[in-house]
Amino acid sequence: VLVDGDLTYDPVVAPMMLECLIKDKLEMLNIARIGAKGSYRKGHRLGNFLLTKTVKIIFGSGLDDMLSGYRIFTRRFVKTFPSKSDGFEIETELTVHSLEMKIPIGESSAKYEERPHGSVSKLSTFRDGINILLLIIRLFFLVKPITSFSLVSAFLAITSIINGWLQVIKPWIDNDEITKYPSVIMSSSLMVLAIFM
């Protein structure tokens, strides 16, 4: 059982969730947060929604609360998980690992309470959000190299064609001369990069 130690998650549901993991033959059970008013800041809620949606689009996750700090795993899952993160990116790494391995995962939900009075969250909305987004991009290139490099290659080729047409070919057709040599070099370089990407 993995749970954030900030007293915001309900530990009482852990045995029931463990039974659910065993009964449904899951390797990982994510416990989505049902927040009381004021327990979950709007910026964090929006960031969680956007990052979870990004992982769903790229990796096909079925989770609705990817950044929940309450999960239950089998021993086998823990032994196969090569943890590389040391911050709030760990939840993303766990989710992507389970999707990459194509193992059965599930999601349930439990109450999420306000932090105890006087305790302060270590989560920095922007810094940690950017770190998680960079991890998603890095994992996209590691887990799906053909798709990711093909997208970069297509972007470079399209940029090369548009720049070449607007800055080089069209002016050459209209004026019968090439005046923007830097654009020629740039378009050519982008196309070479696109081909060899």
Which residues does each PLM region occupy?
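Hydrophobic helical membrane-anchoring modules
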Residues: 85, 92-197
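Acceptor/aglycone-binding surface of glycosyltransferases and processive sugar-polymer synthases
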Residues: 11-88, 92, 113-130
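Short, intrinsically disordered, charge-balanced linker/junction segments flanking boundaries
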Residues: 4, 24-27, 194-197
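Glycine-/small-residue-rich active-site loops that bind phosphorylated ligands and cofactors
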Residues: 9, 35-38, 140, 157
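Short beta-strand-to-loop acidic/aromatic patch adjacent to the donor-nucleotide binding site
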Residues: 1-8
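Short beta-strands and strand-loop turn motifs
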Residues: 2, 30-33, 107-110
